[in-house]
A protein has these predicted regions:
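Short, positively charged patches
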Residues: 1-151
Length: 152
């Protein structure tokens, strides 16, 4: 069936991010707030696996912004990213990385502000749903304005 996602689950699309990059992006989505542009740029420049290794203190981070590294280390990952991916797959969700075939090309209009990755639920390919979809999203640290609008 064309336009439907297969049982890729935690692996995302058939072609795309390797396992290390996928796990690192999953881990980073747990500890970083949406819109952390410096993180997205660092992951694109250095690789998400290198950024995640630096956050865990397993590798040096000479090319990683010190303020970003400090911010990420304030939010330790309590669960391994493998568990998050397994739980998502159990709910019929999948984890889409920018390297995946399914990644919506339309996100390029965000000019460096695109998300690190996307958690998606449903069978329709994200790349095909993107042009006719609406999303309501939020962050853990909502502003007063955001809270007011969401409650209306």
């Amino acid at each position: 069936m064309t336009g439907l996602a297969g049982p890729a689950g935690p692996a995302g699309s058939a072609a795309g991010a390797d396992a290390g990059e996928r796990l690192a992006r999953a881990a980073l989505t747990r500890i970083a707030e949406p819109g952390t542009t410096a993180l997205v740029r660092a992951a694109d420049r250095l690789g998400a696996a290198a950024v995640w290794a630096a956050v865990r203190g397993e590798a040096g981070a000479p090319d990683l912004d010190a303020d970003l590294l400090e911010l990420l280390r304030k939010h330790p990952a309590e669960f391994p990213p493998e568990r998050d991916l397994e739980l998502a797959a159990g709910l019929g969700a999948r984890f889409i990385c920018p390297q995946d075939d399914e990644w919506p090309a339309g996100l390029a209009v965000l000019g460096g502000e695109e998300p690190l990755a996307l958690w998606v639920r449903g069978e329709l390919l994200l790349s095909e749903a993107f042009d006719r979809a609406v999303a309501v999203v939020g962050a853990r640290a909502a502003t007063a304005y955001g809270g007011r609008v969401a409650s209306e």
